Curated annotation (Swiss-Prot):
Record protein name field: BAR/IMD domain-containing adapter protein 2-like 2
Organism whose genome encodes this protein: Danio rerio
Comp. bias intervals (Polar residues): 226-236, 355-376
Free-text domain note: The IMD domain is predicted to have a helical structure. It may induce actin bundling and filopodia formation.
Topological type in the membrane: Peripheral membrane protein
Short name of one Pfam family: SH3_9
Residue ranges annotated for the SH3 domain, each copy included: 274-337
Gene Ontology cellular-component annotations: cytosol; nucleoplasm; plasma membrane
């Protein structure tokens, strides 16, 4: 009877190995291929959707220039922008699906093929050795216990228990990844559903109002107002061109006087409501691996697109490249504070404050400034000091107190808050990318992360809507009877579905704020 039980255990263990090697891993590879095709189809859909709703927005602009359909043109523009925002939101979910599901499955299935094959070879070799040892003991009569309590039977039971756990681990990985995808879609629906319903009702009311109101003939006052608006737009366009002349080479993608729209812009920007003030970089901001940070060189012109800094960070546009992103507020200063270098030196040589400053203090200022990690934005002088602020970082004319206070301000920049604004007009792109510091491939829950976070050097970890799964290593260790010899069927550190791997935090490139 014991021989029958051992044979059943051995065959059951081999069948699980065959299932993983012949069915699970090929099926997982097929899912990866189909998932990549799914993403390509959505990308084609998003591209066509962008072209369609861009054309719809142009039709709305044409309606805005008429006297009878201005309200309808506004409705068309808002519908176009909202649909493009929804497409951008869905693109974030699909990017998460590609990185966290498809790439993880593809990587694990390639590693698991060799891992399971090696584990099966170790198992079969150990079974043969245990069976030969038991047979020698029975032949010599040295084995007096029952066959059920032998090391051979214990090894068969333990091996079957471990391979069943490995099989469960792989199917749990597949289920958890797609639960995370469902949670991402549900989060997107809950975030945008209410505001979209309110907007749709408002659009329907405006269309109904235009149906009930009769078209009127334009009066001379209306014609005069339209003429004034057209002349004002032409004058405004000329002023903008004159403002750009002293700024150097005009970029090839200079902003048009007409309102432009992009997928990542807000509704306020698309209607021409967003403004900005011109700033100049006092030091260079080098490029980094974070795509939301805006690199620039010293002396470059930037247009700040938000009215006030957010925890020490500004969001703006680099005028030469028209690229947008975040940068420290201490790295720029107003263009009004800058004068030509020769004039600055002349004023500095005749300044009374410079005559009173000792040389040692200037040297200490320079040395202290070199120790500061980033420069502090220059403060306005009093009316009696006629010195101009030079864009060079060597500010020898500042006092020690001024430098210390600036140094303290820079080093105490708080990390920006990561709370989301859930207002009806907030349809910023999100993508719940999980931030996993020490996550097992199969033993941890999928956490959702927002792409709306500001990009500080070390942002705080967001609270996940999913409960954190605690891994209990002691519960997975099978309880053995009689302490059979340890065998490396599934050695730690090489299992692609259980190895803990650290990964850096990734910030989405859709962190732009709503520009009022």
């Amino acid at each position: 009877m014991s021989g029958v039980n051992s044979d059943l255990l051995h065959r059951s263990t081999l069948s699980v190995y065959n299932n993983l090697m012949d069915q699970f891993n090929p099926g997982l590879q097929k899912l990866v291929t189909l998932g990549n095709s799914y993403i390509k189809a959505f990308q084609a859909l998003a591209l066509t959707s962008e072209a369609y709703f861009s054309a719809l927005a142009k039709m709305g602009e044409q309606a805005l220039s008429t006297l009878s359909s201005r309200s309808l043109g506004d409705v068309l523009i808002q519908i176009s922008e909202t649909q493009r925002k929804l497409t951008a939101e869905a693109e974030g979910v699909f990017r998460w699906f590609h990185v966290e599901v498809l790439q993880a499955m593809d990587k694990n299935v390639k590693l698991d093929e060799e891992y399971i094959e090696g584990s099966r070879r170790v198992y079969e070799l150990e079974v043969r050795n245990q069976a030969a040892s038991l047979e020698r003991q029975l032949r010599r009569g040295a084995f007096r216990d029952s066959l059920e309590s032998s090391e051979y039977m214990q090894y068969l039971r333990q091996s079957q228990h471990e391979i069943l756990k490995e099989e469960e681990r792989r199917y749990r990985f597949l289920a958890e990844k797609h639960c995370g995808l469902t949670q991402s879609l549900l989060y997107l629906i809950n975030k945008t559903g209410v505001s979209l319903q309110q907007r749709a009702d408002g659009w329907k009311e405006k269309v109904s109002e235009s149906r009930s109101s009769r078209p009127r003939t334009p009066t001379p006052l209306d014609q005069e107002a339209q003429l004034k608006s057209s002349v004002g737009s032409l004058l405004q366009t000329g002023d903008r061109e004159m403002d750009r002349e002293p700024l150097g080479r005009v970029p090839s993608r200079a902003p048009s006087p007409l309102p432009s729209r992009s997928r990542s812009s807000s509704v306020g920007e698309s209607l021409g409501l967003g403004g900005g003030r011109s700033m100049r970089a006092i030091v260079s901001h080098p490029a980094s691996s974070n795509p939301v940070l805006l690199p620039f060189a010293r002396g470059d012109l930037l247009t700040v697109l938000i009215p006030e800094p957010r925890n020490g960070w500004l969001y703006g546009r680099h005028d030469p490249s028209l690229r947008q992103g975040w940068f420290p507020a201490a790295y720029v200063a107003s263009t009004e504070d800058f004068l030509p270098v020769g004039l600055s030196i002349s004023h500095r040589s005749h300044s009374m404050n410079n005559l009173l400053e000792p040389t040692s203090q200037s040297e200490s200022d320079t040395q202290t400034y070199s120790e500061v990690s980033s420069p502090v934005v220059s403060m306005r002088r009093a009316s009696a000091d006629v010195r101009s602020v030079s864009p060079l970082p060597e500010k020898k004319t500042e006092s020690n107190n001024e430098l210390k206070s600036g140094q303290k301000v820079f080093h105490e920049i708080p990390a920006p808050a990561t709370q989301l604004r859930r207002g009806s007009a907030d349809v910023r792109s999100i993508s719940p990318l999980p931030d996993r510091r020490a996550e097992s491939h199969f033993e941890s829950k999928v956490e959702l992360k927002n792409y709306n976070e500001l990009p500080p050097p070390a942002p705080p970890l967001p609270n996940s809507p999913l409960p954190e799964r605690k891994t209990d290593l002691t519960s997975e260790r099978p309880s053995t009877q009689g302490q059979p010899p340890e065998h490396p069927l599934f050695p730690r550190g090489s299992n692609p579905f259980a190895t803990v791997k650290l990964r850096p935090t990734v910030t989405n490139d859709r962190s732009a704020p709503r520009i009022q």
